[in-house]
Swiss-Prot record:
Source organism (scientific name): Xenopus laevis
TM regions (residue ranges): none
Keyword Amino-acid biosynthesis belongs to the record: no
Keyword entries, A-Z: Leucine-rich repeat, Repeat
LRR repeats: 14-34, 35-56, 58-80, 81-102, 105-125, 128-149, 151-173, 174-195, 197-218, 220-240
InterPro entries from the UniProt entry: Leu-rich_rpt (IPR001611), Leu-rich_rpt_typical-subtyp (IPR003591), LRR_dom_sf (IPR032675), LRR_domain-containing (IPR050216)
Protein name: Leucine-rich repeat-containing protein 58
PROSITE patterns xref list: LRR
Gene: lrrc58
Length: 350
């Protein structure tokens, strides 16, 4: 039997579409192993990698997609120069990898089309990771520890069973592309608006009924995909309004009327509470609110073509217009509409 094909100046070991069930790397000479930078193994029948793969000390890319892989052992840890690991469409799950991967220098990890029910902790130990793809798995949640991937730019989690988005995603300073389509997400955390590097946000085919108004502050967002969501208007008067507490009423009175006070004149809990005031977004209202507020859906134009329902928080039911959830209301801010149209250059709704 002839040895595996080594091409492109002895840098690429190409073994695609050969129906291999076992990988005999002993046929590759020791000198050649040191030169190989890419190993391509897609469309075979491999179940595991042989330990000898660790001898490819200059390997940058390993593609084992479209096999029957169930396990990737600790030999992967010996590939200290590995930047890209592609293992799409296998039978891998959260128990298929070494428990400690923090020493790896991976930048691209694609494990879409496998059997993951949760994102393994060891993936969240790789600070160099720039691209993580786990689409088409069985994920039910995104762990808060996702914030540990401080270099992450691309996150693909489409086609899972995710129902919520953790606010910790806002702590990823370089995140530019976030794909969460085809899940079961019902709401977007307002903190997501802090990801100012975000350029593309795919949320189509979820269970969204509104968007938080904070999304307007995503100044670099060029693509927003929302097709296939209910986006059902929920009228504010259909919601139960809980009366403010005495503490909130006191805070509102002081803030709204600008009543002067000295620190020793007020209880300590009220002093701390006053710092938590939020201004009512109704331009005709000068009031504030703390814990008690009324939710209102307001439509905002994007690109002069689409109208998106954004969630507003008002200080009381009196601040909501009877027409607040129709095409225009008296409390609509033309500035917000113009800014939104300018910032959202491409809204994918169809």
């Amino acid at each position: 039997m002839e040895g595996p094909e080594v091409t492109d100046g002895d840098n690429v070991l190409n073994l695609t579409h050969l129906g291999l069930e076992n990988l005999n790397l002993e046929l590759v000479s020791e000198n050649k192993r040191k030169d190989v930078q890419q190993i391509l193994l897609p469309h075979n029948r491999l179940v595991v990698l042989p330990p000898l793969v660790a001898s490819f000390i200059h390997l940058h890319l390993l593609d084992i997609s479209n096999n029957n892989m169930v396990y990737i052992g600790e030999e992967i840890l010996g590939l200290t120069k590995l930047k890209t690991l592609l293992a799409k469409n296998n039978r891998l799950d959260e128990f298929s990898f070494p428990k400690e991967m923090g020493g790896m220098r991976l930048e691209v990890l694609n494990l879409s089309g496998n059997r993951f029910e949760e994102i393994p902790d060891q993936f969240l130990q790789i600070p160099t990771l720039k691209s993580l793809s786990l689409g088409g798995n069985r994920l039910k949640s995104i762990p808060a520890e996702i914030e540990n991937l401080i270099s992450l730019e691309f996150l693909y989690l489409g086609g899972n069973f995710i129902s919520s988005i953790p606010s910790e995603l806002a702590n990823l300073p370089y995140l530019s592309y976030l794909v969460l389509c085809d899940n079961r997400i019902q709401s977007i955390p307002p903190q997501l608006a802090q990801v100012h590097s975000l350029r593309s946000l795919s949320l189509h085919n979820n269970l969204l009924t509104y968007l938080p108004r904070e999304i307007l502050s995503l100044v670099h967002l060029h693509e927003l995909s929302l097709r296939g969501n209910p986006l059902v208007v929920r009228f504010v008067r259909d919601l139960t309004y809980t009366p403010p507490t005495l503490l909130e009423l006191a805070g509102r009175t002081i803030k709204s009327h600008g009543i002067p006070y000295c620190p020793w004149e007020l209880p300590e809990n009220l002093l701390r509470y006053l710092d938590l005031a939020s201004k009512c977004p109704n331009p005709k209202c000068s009031g504030v609110y703390f814990d008690c507020c009324v939710r209102q859906i307001k439509f905002v134009d994007f690109c002069g073509k689409y109208r998106l329902p954004l969630m507003h928080y008002l200080c009381s039911p009196e601040c909501s217009s009877p027409c607040g959830s129709t095409s225009h209301s008296e409390s609509d801010s033309e500035d917000e509409v113009n800014v939104a149209a300018r910032r959202m250059q491409k809204v994918l709704l169809g």
